[in-house]
């Protein structure tokens, strides 16, 4: 079975690079990707995107002029369509140590140019994973959050033994995160059962990778530790062995080298045992092959790499000089970013203008959205006189939020380059307006929960909450008057503020009178109520722009509002997360005629008598029973309304991507990855259960599994016995 595992894209590297080097003693032969030039290109591209062209090569990652690119060596069978993204991400991870840790989806308007570049690179990576594979992308980004949190915790710990250290190091060094990325890139998919079978072998390989990394990076890390007078901690296997076993660093390095060989030997033994089982999985064998490639690739790459030792020439600067800045930009050119292509090609503009048409029906595999980044807000200076008025605002402002509007402001600033002072004013005004609308919405809708917490008016009273909401509108105007006259006219003379109130009024009228609007009427209401604030944001920023002041994104903002509101309607009735935050189908309690309900009540061949009666009852303040809500969900489902709603969302999602590409071209080709990520995160998916990231305790279990077993003579062994047996073999 193992003989059938082929290397489609991998080729062996020249043995002269490593065969005669005494520092290379791996049991495995190294390979490299046939298209390694792509990995080199995107590695340089990542430097340009992150720090600008003048800073290319100021830090070191993938590139190695001696042996080849790290990603090319460790994932030599990576699929061509995923290769560039995988290599770009690994390059960013290499550079990450020199940056402040944060999640892949962090976006802020109040940052330096350097930090803004970092946010844009993170957004590019996140958006591309979500575009290519929503389920894996969701897992992958969550795993990154685990990694960045772990780095802060682990580096302050002490470890009683090397095994305790390795249990943590796998997470600290992002070994599993990196190898899962390589696995996805190589098109390898394991079932949960196959994952469990492979885990002990995976652990041994991950530990070997960490040990080899520690061996080759030791001299550099120790020098940094001494130079900093101990401020830079020593998180390295050599140091752990020296401390726990009372050895010199030289002797500790020899012990670590023996550990590396022991882990490779154990990997081979476990692999042989698995291959001898009945019907070994082809995917598991492909995974084991990838692990072998990664162990060999990491080792040969480490022999002479700028990250660990001085080199005569800078491979990044040499590559840029040879190929130029245009050639290295191979990751997702503009004409490839809209997905899926065929759907866009076949789409008619008339279909997009009327999302209620039957042509909106389609099948797709969308993505469940992540939580948004932490919002940075402009707050009102609270005098003693203001404090009672602001209590409801302070409360609702403190609740968790997806921060879509904050993210939109940060994303649009990539084009408009609004001065910092004006940007903060716009951000603050929008925050006041948004929270004002939330306070009023909760009262008008009769809501009980907001983001999983009691609504403000239940705590502070209806009268006080209404007063706060109207006060916030005045405060928003007060802020906007600090901007240019054109910005003030956007707020006072253009109809967006009127549209917000008129849209909300129509929504309340329909619910109170149980009047079922047409889908087109509903979307018209959404264009005012939700799209109005998005358009207001874009127009305020455009009025203060120092660049692209003629760039009008009103159509994009309108469609974004439609997508946002219809998605919210769908999630309220279908999402487990919404149930946690707002209660189970609370739109039904409120008697709200949301988009899926409107579609269901206009389905031909069905009587609406029962549904109408339920909605009239809810207007009398009756909270619907669980059984009644389940009945209504069954009715809506049977009429195909949820499927049709998803089809509408799919069309809107695709058109938003098309408009984004069109706008990027109008903005001089400036790619807006933060905006692209926002669109991807607002896409909707089935609530699939994705395996949670594996913790260090998980790898502790697999550490014990890896070293428990039988030698060929049938005697039970553990790691210590295995090391002794290997030493005896070498002595013979």
UniProtKB/Swiss-Prot annotation:
Similarity comment text for this entry: In the N-terminal section; belongs to the terpene synthase family.
UniProt-annotated stretches for the region Prenyltransferase: 312-732
Binding-site residues for Mg(2+) 2, renumbered to this chain: 97
Catalysed reactions, as listed in the record: isopentenyl diphosphate + (2E,6E)-farnesyl diphosphate = (2E,6E,10E)-geranylgeranyl diphosphate + diphosphate
Binding site for isopentenyl diphosphate: 402, 405, 434, 451
Molecular function terms from GO: metal ion binding; prenyltransferase activity; terpene synthase activity
Function in brief: Bifunctional terpene synthase; part of the gene cluster that mediates the biosynthesis of conidiogenone, a diterpene known to induce the conidiation. The bifunctional terpene synthase PchDS converts isopentenyl diphosphate (IPP) and dimethylallyl diphosphate (DMAPP) into deoxyconidiogenol. The C-terminal prenyltransferase (PT) domain of PchDS catalyzes formation of GGPP, whereas the N-terminal terpene cyclase (TC) domain catalyzes the cyclization of GGPP into deoxyconidiogenol. The cytochrome P450 monooxygenase PchP450 then catalyzes two rounds of oxidation to furnish conidiogenone.
Residue positions binding Mg(2+) 1: 97
Protein name per its UniProtKB record: Conidiogenone synthase
Span of the annotated motif NSE/DTE: 213-221
Motif placement: DDXXD 1: 97-101
